[in-house]
Amino acid sequence: MAKRLNIVEEKFLDTIKNNNLINSGDKIVVGVSGGPDSLTLLTLLNKYKSKFNYEIIVAHVNHLIRKDSTDDEQFVENYCKKNGIKFYCKRVNVQEIAKQQKKGEEEVGRNERYKFFDEICEKENANKIAIAHNMNDNAETMILNLIRGTGLNGLEGIQPSQYNNRFIRPLINCNRNEIEDFCKENNLEPRIDSTNKENIYKRNIIRNKLIPFLKELNPNIIETLSRTSVIIAENNEFIQKEAQKNFNKITELKSNLVEIDLKDFNKMPIAMRKAIIQLSIDKLNGNIRNISKKNIDDIIKLAENNIGNKYIIYKNIKAEVKKGKLKIQINERQIENSN
């Protein structure tokens, strides 16, 4: 009788199958810090690469924050040498960059990691990036986004794949305890980031203080939030598809300008109008980060009033009404004033 697979291994395989994350011939860059999550991901991807006919390459970013970060780097490199896996490493002074850019270390670290993963993808002609996010990460992200203030996109949390399977997350349905048990059962000795216990980042406070409190109210809060994120993602997918259909019907997209026919636009439900505005900005700007609910509401109000020669400027985005059309434009240089 065949040995029953560990729950993490079962979920790993189910997530790949149900979301079509990996195909034969894929070349996958795996982000590996050396911690329990990424070591588990690497171990499983390495185990199944021959069976599913894909190739893996490891990318490790040393943030130079912790004293033992060089040991983490060496640990991952040794694992790759032992298993015959191509290894790339980049050392980045995250604290220095954060000071220069006046951003948080967590944000800068994430940006630098993803930038490096993209670089290795291009260098190796890889088509996918595997990230070791788990179910707990998803719950923390949902709560963090809710605290910041967010719409449906933020409440989706972390999905199994992103950008047409450019990013894949085979462990997203595994919780942290399951992953730690997998490491013990398979005699893996992952690196432990001591800063995870320090409440120096918002995410750590959510992880170490808020979630334990929520577990007193609902012991299965991690799984509950995971199910909720799936429901929200399914509903949001429908809205986004409908928004794209309506966008195609009532807008004209130019290089740095979207023109929206207000006659049809103003008849649509408010949720659809907001989705079309967000889609317009995303198509022009490449993202909708830092665009608040108030910014969207102001543009909606501008469109409803439909008074010519009125406009709103937010950073590099200008919205104005002219001749029955709402025009949303991206300016190359950032404009700080508003009308």
Where are these regions (language model features)?
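Internal, active-site/partner-interface "lid" segment
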Residues: 197-203, 222-233
